[in-house]
């Protein structure tokens, strides 16, 4: 039995209406009371705290805030402890070899069994299997800052770019190195253009270079006569006789200028199938045929007003409807443009009062495609399979992807044959091997996936809000067989996989299969507490199915399995990079061999890194995946046949018997229903027959 005081206190707590219980209003609104609504709201049970005088009210709020914040920190620490308990430290693998350099390399490229490293006024060629330098060329006017290498069958096309922006073409055939041409080198330095970007088709049939000079930007496309080069090297004497009067190469390297280096590094175990070291020599007396100029492309001009006075005049004089509905070929009068600009300035005048920054030059992204259906080709033009036939290009800040046919001559006009418009400006694009798949990334974070070989749109997927694409990489399609990633050794269609690195350092896996549409999966989330773990670069590893290399700001390198979203191992190499600057890793992954090379630095007289890059020696560290126990089996057993896939999908006998039994039950039910329907139909027909007889 409770006391009287307790009952009184309970009544006071339950009394939340200031004026007693509310009366039931009459049905008509006119009879409702005119009292203020605040008289009927619930009282705040914590109002007594807000009624405290100052400074006690402020002290109470500060104490509450401090207590809540302390509780949040305690919860975060507990969650981190749980993660650390479950965290498995990955195996750390060290490099198997090291290439010591005199200075920081100006780019690296891998092709066939060779490694190319840009350096002091030239580049060096290394044997990829034993890391021995087999040739060095140092006759440029400036240091090389980037270098590319492309397979041309059994030969290699080498394209270095120096600090002056001059791009050169070299051809490596067996044990001979040839200089083909310096694409943009001129005698007058004031007219010298700079190469900003370049792209070579998959088989080396075409090359495109983006140049900048005299306040202008343009793209030049060349056809590479690689078949003619082979014939000229097979019959060098006839070639020399025909080109005896030609101008001598400006770049000549005498044999005495070529020096061999003695490597102090210990090489890895050389496999039995590795190539033998070649004595490469520079052939300065033989001049190969020059690349053939195809076309020059400039950025699209801004839309100007038309002189047509009416739409009828436009339809009467415009015969071509190419680009209809694509945002091109607009006919807008000058008056309309003036009205549009006046409205714009009136709306955003306060934002435009400051100083205007100089508009940057247009930059372009371009790719070579092998699908004829992207352009309208003439019937008499035939394109060989495996040869690039279309160039796709999009300019910064533009909504359109333009397609140009490569089956042109210098007399033809440089006009696009097709255009793909997008709802938002295209900020990035990427193609897969032999341009089978195309990915377009728009400014609004939308990713568009195309199967160009079949002319099929996989669909559109939107990245999470606030995520913007930093880089995108296609992965070769793989299967998970008995817990291991494997490549199918048979053709696969309508299957695409790619990894997307966003600007917030999150990593996503985007997959699409047939008509199901693309889906996105988070592999690595955005770092919140430890920003040094943020991802700065990603690289697929073709030798390991479903594996990607992840480079973090902390200068760590890990290998991730995208199927499980798990880190398998880490790679350790000495690095010497200032902590204040963001790390831009310089690396190269072999597309045909299980090799991976990373630039690093050794401090002088030490084995640990230092923050002073001037007190360190540059090196390129060599990693062979097959030398590591965890990755050896994955690299050697990376393919699976279609028969093995079908056999693994076969059901056991018990499952098959159960399926047959279930089907027989369903058939029995269907037969019973059919008999019932037939009996009802017979009864109904007999009843109708009796009714007819009565009439």
Swiss-Prot record:
Key words, A-Z: WD repeat
Region (Disordered): 1-35
Tissues where the protein occurs: Testis-specific. Expressed in spermatogonia, spermatocytes and spermatids.
InterPro entries referenced in this protein's UniProt entry, alphabetically: NADH_UbQ_FeS_4_mit-like (IPR006885), WD40/YVTN_repeat-like_dom_sf (IPR015943), WD40_repeat_dom_sf (IPR036322), WDR93_beta_propeller (IPR049547)
Source organism superkingdom: Eukaryota
Renumbered ranges of WD repeats: 421-460
UniProt xrefs under PROSITE patterns: WD_REPEATS_1
GO biological process, any: electron transport chain
PANTHER family attached to this UniProt entry: NADH-UBIQUINONE OXIDOREDUCTASE, WD REPEAT-CONTAINING PROTEIN 93
Protein name listed in UniProt: WD repeat-containing protein 93
Organism: Mus musculus
Gene that specifies this protein: Wdr93
């Amino acid at each position: 039995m409770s006391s009287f005081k307790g009952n009184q206190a309970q009544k006071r707590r339950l009394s939340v209406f200031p004026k007693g219980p509310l009366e039931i209003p009459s049905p008509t609104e006119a009879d409702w009371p005119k009292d203020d609504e605040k008289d009927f709201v619930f009282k705040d049970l914590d109002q007594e705290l807000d009624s405290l005088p100052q400074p006690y009210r402020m002290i109470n709020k500060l104490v509450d805030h401090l207590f809540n914040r302390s509780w949040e920190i305690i919860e975060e620490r507990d969650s981190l402890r749980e993660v650390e308990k479950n965290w498995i430290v990955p195996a750390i693998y060290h490099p198997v070899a090291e290439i010591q350099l005199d200075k920081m390399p100006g780019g690296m490229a891998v092709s066939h069994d060779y490694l190319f490293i840009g350096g002091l006024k030239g580049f060096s060629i290394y044997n990829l299997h034993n890391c021995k330098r087999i040739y060095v060329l140092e006759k440029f006017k400036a240091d090389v800052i980037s270098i590319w290498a492309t397979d041309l069958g059994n030969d290699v096309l080498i394209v270095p770019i120096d600090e002056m922006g001059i791009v050169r073409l070299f051809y490596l055939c067996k044990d001979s190195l040839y200089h083909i041409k310096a694409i943009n080198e001129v005698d007058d330095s004031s007219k010298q253009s700079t190469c900003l970007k370049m792209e070579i088709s998959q088989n080396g049939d075409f090359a495109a270079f983006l140049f900048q000079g005299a306040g202008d930007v343009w793209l030049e496309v060349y056809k590479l006569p690689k078949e003619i080069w082979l014939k000229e090297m097979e019959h060098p004497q006839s070639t020399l006789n025909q080109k005896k009067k030609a101008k001598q190469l400006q770049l000549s390297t005498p044999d005495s200028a070529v020096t061999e280096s003695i490597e102090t590094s210990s090489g890895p175990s050389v496999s039995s199938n590795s190539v033998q070291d070649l004595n490469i020599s520079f052939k300065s007396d033989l001049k190969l045929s020059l690349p053939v100029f195809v076309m020059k492309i400039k950025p699209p001009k801004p839309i100007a007003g038309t002189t047509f006075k009416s739409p009828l005049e436009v339809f009467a004089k415009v015969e071509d409807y190419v680009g209809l509905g694509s945002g091109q070929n607009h006919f807008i009068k000058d008056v309309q443009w003036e009205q549009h600009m006046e409205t714009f300035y009136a709306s955003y005048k306060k934002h435009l009062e400051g100083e205007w920054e100089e508009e940057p030059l247009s930059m372009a992204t371009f790719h070579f495609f092998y699908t004829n259906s992207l352009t309208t080709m003439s019937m008499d033009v035939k394109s060989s399979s495996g040869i690039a036939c279309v160039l796709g290009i999009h300019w910064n800040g533009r909504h359109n992807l333009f397609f140009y046919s490569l089956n042109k001559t210098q007399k033809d006009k440089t006009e696009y044959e097709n255009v793909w418009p997008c709802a938002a400006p295209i900020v990035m694009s990427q193609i897969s091997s032999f341009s089978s798949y195309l990915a377009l990334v728009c400014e609004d974070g939308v990713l568009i996936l195309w199967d160009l070989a079949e002319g099929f749109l996989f669909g559109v997927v939107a990245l999470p809000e606030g995520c913007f694409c930093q880089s995108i990489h296609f992965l070769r399609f793989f299967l998970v067989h008995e817990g291991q990633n494997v490549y199918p050794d048979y053709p696969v269609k309508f299957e695409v996989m790619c990894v997307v690195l966003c600007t917030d350092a999150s990593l996503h896996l985007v997959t699409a299969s047939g008509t199901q549409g693309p889906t996105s999966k988070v592999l690595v989330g955005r770092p919140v507490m430890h920003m040094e773990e943020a991802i700065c670069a990603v690289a697929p590893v073709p030798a390991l199915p479903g594996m990607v290399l992840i480079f973090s700001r902390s200068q760590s390198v890990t290998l991730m399995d995208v199927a499980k979203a798990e880190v398998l191992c880490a790679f350790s190499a000495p690095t010497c990079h200032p902590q204040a600057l963001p790390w831009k890793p310089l690396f190269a992954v072999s597309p045909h061999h299980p090799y991976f090379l990373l630039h690093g630095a050794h401090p002088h007289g030490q084995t640990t890194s230092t923050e002073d890059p001037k007190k360190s020696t540059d090196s390129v560290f060599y990693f062979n995946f097959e030398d590591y126990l965890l990755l050896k089996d994955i690299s050697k057993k990376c393919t699976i046949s279609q028969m093995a896939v079908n056999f693994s999908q076969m059901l056991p006998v018990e499952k098959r018997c159960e399926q047959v039994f279930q089907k027989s039950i369903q058939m029995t039910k269907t037969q019973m229903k059919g008999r019932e329907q037939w009996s009802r139909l017979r009864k109904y027909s007999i009843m109708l027959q009796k009714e007819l007889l009565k009439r």
